[in-house]
A protein has these predicted regions:
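Transmembrane helix-loop junctions in multipass membrane proteins, especially transporters and channels
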Residues: 40-44, 72, 112-120, 138-145
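Membrane-interfacial loop-to-helix junctions in multi-pass inner-membrane proteins
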Residues: 41-54, 90-97, 144
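Structural signal for membrane-spanning alpha-helices in multi-pass inner-membrane proteins
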Residues: 32-39, 107-115, 133-137, 157-160
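Alpha-helical transmembrane segments in multi-pass membrane proteins
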Residues: 31, 35, 51, 55-59, ...
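Multi-pass membrane catalytic core of lipid/isoprenoid biosynthesis enzymes
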Residues: 54, 72-126
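Functional transmembrane core segments of multi-pass inner-membrane proteins
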Residues: 37-51, 121-129, 133, 148-160
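Interhelical loop and helix-boundary elements at the membrane-water interface
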Residues: 2-27, 73-99, 134-152
Length: 160
């Protein structure tokens, strides 16, 4: 009974983060994790691997929320997207923005928790990545090759 209620509450959140569709997350995380194993040192510390995976999930979720905020009205009219949580009013816009800012804050904390040696560079790169992440969804309207912007966003995961 309690799990059923919890599922009803969490389902739209997982959907807006696209955590119910892991393909995009895997495509993002594989290069980021490869970069950890390609460093000249020994195997990476598993705490760092964990932080990169969690940070990647948070940032990709943040990007998906930004996409749904940008496209809310369009998504309602498209068969493939009309059941997304914002388009179908399962989640309201205030909650979506709150979740976006929560993920942004948690991602910032994860970046601050990275080893001191590369922390400030990672933080700098994270701040450089943020505008790209937030404008990518709108780029489908004004840029002929929005996938280029998406690849820049995902490339930051390797650099960080």
């Amino acid at each position: 009974m309690i799990f059923q209620k919890l599922k009803v509450y969490l389902q739209p959140i997982f959907e807006i983060l696209r955590w119910n569709k892991p393909t995009g997350r895997i495509i993002l995380l594989i290069p980021a994790c490869w970069s950890l194993w390609l460093t000249p040192n020994d195997q990476p510390d598993y705490q760092i691997v964990f932080k990169i995976i969690i940070g990647g999930l948070f940032v990709s979720g943040l990007g998906c929320i930004a996409n749904d905020i940008w496209d809310k009205d369009i998504d309602k009219k498209v068969l493939r997207t009309r059941n997304r949580p914002l388009a179908s009013d399962k989640i309201d816009i205030k909650f979506a923005f709150s979740l976006l800012f929560l993920l942004l804050f948690l991602s910032f904390l994860i970046t601050l928790s990275l080893p001191e040696k590369g922390r400030y560079l990672s933080l700098f790169l994270a701040f450089l990545a943020l505008p790209w992440i937030l404008i990518y969804p709108s780029s489908k309207r004004w840029f002929k090759f929005p996938q280029l912007i998406l690849s820049i966003c995902w490339g930051f995961a390797v650099l960080i």
